[in-house]
Structures are given as structure tokens and as C-alpha cells.
Swiss-Prot record:
Residues 299-308 are annotated as: Connecting peptide. The lineage of its organism: Eukaryota, Metazoa, Chordata, Craniata, Vertebrata. Residues 337-361 are annotated as: Disordered. PANTHER family: HLA CLASS I HISTOCOMPATIBILITY ANTIGEN, ALPHA CHAIN G, MHC CLASS I-RELATED. Residues 209-297 form the Ig-like C1-type domain. Belongs to the MHC class I family. This is Class I histocompatibility antigen, B alpha chain.
Length: 365
């Protein structure tokens, strides 16, 4: 597999940034690149997306009508025309490098061109609360399996199999680790600082989760308690169930944090409990947007505020009022009938059998 495109292809800052600002917490920048070969077509599809923390900010797709690096966040749109031109050219160069790497990998693994194959890469950097590099990443995969990755020292590689060892030897001979380290410690950190400043209203906000617990009967003797956290940012959150103060991590069902589509996230954790023991379980929520961790319990539905006997009494009173009204109407009509004669009296008796329509019929004289 040939040497990957130099990491210095990212647009460099025109001037050095002073790394003295203190951030609310740790932050990260990641680029995820994927190339998929397609039998019968010369060019594989290449897709690249960039993230700052949990926010996608750029995207490139070689299958687009006019392939270009495109903004996915408002705060990056303020970058000038030169930025987008350089980023587009860099992505296109990576697409060609990945195309060559796919062909090379076929030889390494003795595979034919009849099938579809995939190369993936993730590169990026983490900043600590002090704004300095916490960790750098450069990881590669082939057909969904680890291939080669840069070690935490940013000076050496770990190859996952014999084929990857060929790449490792090539990269060591070309001092690829040194160039990658220079990008991670320099360009990556500088651009992440720039993005955090330009998008601080979005990237450095902390929206606390909206939380509640739901109850779902499983059988006559068991129920599921589900602890919900909705609408929070950033995505990092901890949900834990406890029984009488002891963690129930082994017995929990926990879903991965999911985007809600509006820039926030959601997550839930569930535990199965014996019916009648729900009060022994508490859900504990920790998130950057909370002033302190939350403790939640399932609260059974409250009893009706009006007692049953009160409802019965009200219904009885209403019944008496309606009955009295009907009796009064009938007596009034009988009295009117006696005054006006026989033929109308017969009509009145006939109408009286229509119940609540009596008064309406009486008006049709």
C-alpha cells in the first residue's frame, strides 16, 4: 500500500495562534475518510466528513454533481474562497491516493477485482482543558478491520496483520510518522483552536438534558424502568441505575448516544425490576450542562384528586336535576294541553315519547 497523502495538505494558518485560552473542557477534531471500490467502474466512491466535537462541519462526496468540500455548519461558512478551494483540492488528492491504495491492497490480500472493498481512515487531535494537545490519532482500516494505526507516542505504528506490515515498513522508511506527528501537534491543534473560536456559540455551549423515568410492565411480576435523557449537548453523558445505592451496570440495557436532528442528543438506560420494588431503584445522570448530578426515581401515577364517592355524589345530583327538568316540562305541557283541546293533546302525548326532543317538537306549532 502506498504512502498516504501528506497530512500537511490541510490549509495552514497565516499566522501562529497564541495557545493561552482556557476551554470549558476537552475538545476534538476528526476527519473520517472512506473509499469504496465498485466493480465495473474505474473510480471508487470517496466520502470525507469533518467533525469538531460532536458537530459535523464539512463534507466531500466524489459522487456529487460537482464534487467540492462543502460546509455543514454556519460558523465555518465565514472561511474565505481560498479555504474552500484548498480543501476541495486536498480531498480530491486523497480520493486518488485511496484509489491507488485499494488496488494495492488487492495484491496484498490476493483478492480479485470482482468484489467491492473499502478503505477507511480517521485522523485528528484532542485538546485538553488547557488548550494543548491531549492525544493524536491516525488510524486505517481495510474491509472493516483494523489495518494500521499510529501509536500514542506519535512516533511508531502498529500493524494488524502481515499485509499491514508491508505498509508499516514503507511508512517507516519514508518517515511518515514524523510528518503525521507534525500535522497533529501543529496544524490540527491550530485549526481546532480557530474553529472553536469561530463557532464558540455552538461548540462551547452546554445544554443540560431533559430527564424522566418511564415504567413498562413486562409480565405479572416484572417491569422495565427506562431512564431518559433528551436534548443535551455535548454528547458526552453518563446514565447509571442503582439498586439500594449499588450500581446495576451489569444488568442495564444502555443504548448508544444518538443525535436528535437539531444539534442535540438523546440516550436512555433501562433495567428490569420485580414489580413492587421500583422504589428501590434510582437513575443517576451526569452531564456537563448540569450544575450537579441528577437522581431520578419512577413516580407512580398520582391518585385522582376527586374521590370516587365524590364523583358518585355529583352524578347523583346531576341525575336528579335532569329528572326534575323532565318532570317539569311534562307537567307544563300537560297543563297547556288541557287548555287547548283534544287534537293538540294527542300530539303532545305522541311527542312526549321522544324524550329530550319534547321541547323542540312543542315549538313547531
Amino acid at each position: 500500500m502506498t504512502v498516504m497523502a501528506p497530512r500537511t495538505l490541510l490549509l495552514l494558518l497565516s499566522g501562529a495562534l497564541v495557545l493561552t485560552e482556557t476551554w470549558a473542557g476537552s475538545h476534538s477534531m476528526r476527519y473520517f475518510s472512506t473509499a469504496v471500490s465498485r466493480p465495473g467502474r474505474e473510480e471508487p466512491r470517496y466520502i470525507e466528513v469533518g467533525y469538531v466535537d460532536d458537530t459535523q462541519f464539512v463534507r466531500f462526496d466524489s459522487d456529487a454533481a460537482s464534487p467540492r468540500m462543502e460546509p455543514r455548519a454556519q460558523w465555518v461558512e465565514k472561511e474565505g474562497r481560498e479555504y474552500w478551494e484548498e480543501e476541495t483540492q486536498r480531498a480530491k488528492a486523497f480520493a486518488q491516493t485511496f484509489r491507488v491504495n485499494l488496488q494495492t491492497a488487492l495484491g496484498y490480500y490476493n483478492q480479485s477485482e470482482a468484489g467491492s472493498h473499502t478503505i477507511q481512515m480517521m485522523s485528528g487531535c484532542d485538546l485538553g482543558p488547557d488548550g494543548r494537545l491531549l492525544r493524536g490519532y491516525d488510524q486505517h482500516a481495510y474491509d472493516g478491520k483494523d489495518y494500521i494505526s499510529l501509536n500514542e507516542d506519535l512516533r511508531s505504528w502498529t500493524a494488524a496483520d502481515v499485509a499491514a506490515q508491508i505498509t508499516q515498513r514503507k511508512w517507516e522508511a519514508a518517515n511518515e510518522a514524523e510528518r503525521t506527528r507534525a500535522y497533529l501537534e501543529g496544524t490540527c491543534v491550530e485549526w481546532l483552536h480557530r474553529y472553536l473560536e469561530n463557532g464558540k456559540e455552538t461548540l462551547q455551549r452546554a445544554e443540560p438534558p431533559k430527564t424522566h423515568v418511564t415504567h413498562h410492565p413486562v409480565s405479572d411480576h416484572e417491569a422495565t424502568l427506562r431512564c431518559w435523557a433528551l436534548g443535551f449537548y455535548p454528547a458526552e453523558i453518563t446514565l447509571t441505575w442503582q439498586r439500594d445505592g449499588e450500581d446495576q451496570t451489569q444488568d442495564m440495557e444502555l443504548v448508544e448516544t444518538r443525535p436528535t436532528g437539531n444539534g442535540t442528543f438523546q440516550k436512555w438506560a433501562a433495567v428490569v425490576v420485580l414489580s413492587g420494588e421500583e422504589h428501590r431503584y434510582t437513575c443517576h445522570v451526569q452531564h456537563e450542562g448540569l450544575p450537579e448530578p441528577l437522581t431520578l426515581r419512577w413516580e407512580p401515577p398520582s391518585q385522582p384528586t376527586i374521590p370516587i364517592m365524590g364523583i358518585v355524589a355529583i352524578l347523583a345530583i346531576l341525575g336528579a336535576v335532569v329528572t326534575g327538568a323532565v318532570v317539569t316540562a311534562v307537567m307544563w305541557r300537560k297543563k297547556s294541553s288541557d287548555k287547548k283541546g283534544g287534537s293538540y293533546s294527542q300530539a303532545a302525548r305522541s311527542d312526549s315519547a321522544q324524550g329530550s326532543d319534547v321541547s323542540l317538537t312543542a315549538c313547531k306549532v
